[in-house]
Amino acid sequence: LLALAWLLLPAGPASAAQLAGVDLPDATEADGKVLVLNGLGLREATLMMVDVYVAGLYLEAKSTDPAAIVAADRTKRLVLKFVRSVGRENLVKAFSDGLDKNAGERAAAVAPGFARLNAAMDDVKKGDTLILTYVPGAGTTVRLKDVDVATIEGEDFQSVLFSIWLGPAPLNRSLRDGLLGVDR
């Protein structure tokens, strides 16, 4: 009887996933939709593999197919929690490199959106968060250090933006695998 009573107790708070000492919730909400944590990854940079941020990808439904995630005109969110300070110029360079490697023939069409994204960037410190949320019909909201700094319209823009992490030439393959939930 006690075992049955234990099973009927209400569940505790939503659990969280952890990577490199950073906790991210298993779910979040955007535009009235619940988004589930698809996976976590660690961005490592330079030849010395310096930890830069922990990223979490949130989707309406889990998926391990990067092309389908990028192409889907559905609400999605990428959360970057920085584990070290990064200068604005390094953030802009990373976005520019990702654009060059993943935009292909869409580069000219999405260049104005990336110019707005780069203009919205600022230096980040350890503990700061960058959140990129795409909502169909509304665009991609860029939230940096708890402030909405830009909303960039266009399904093409979000597709190229999310390709930086999920496309054929991602920032790190291990980061992409983590975001797809296949590395854990």
What is each residue range found by the language model?
Residues 60-137:
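Mid-length scaffold segments of soluble, non-membrane domains
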Residues 1-11:
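Bacterial N-terminal signal peptides
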Residues 144-147:
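Short strand-turn-strand beta-turns centered on an Asx-Gly dipeptide
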Residues 17-69:
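N-terminal structural module
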Residues 174-184:
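Cysteine/selenocysteine-centered motifs that mediate thiol-based redox chemistry or coordinate metal-sulfur cofactors
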Residues 12-16:
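Sec/Tat signal peptide C-region and signal peptidase I cleavage site
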Residues 149-175:
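Flexible glycine-rich active-site/ligand-binding loops centered on an Asp-His dyad
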Residues 26-28, 139-142:
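Short polybasic amphipathic segments
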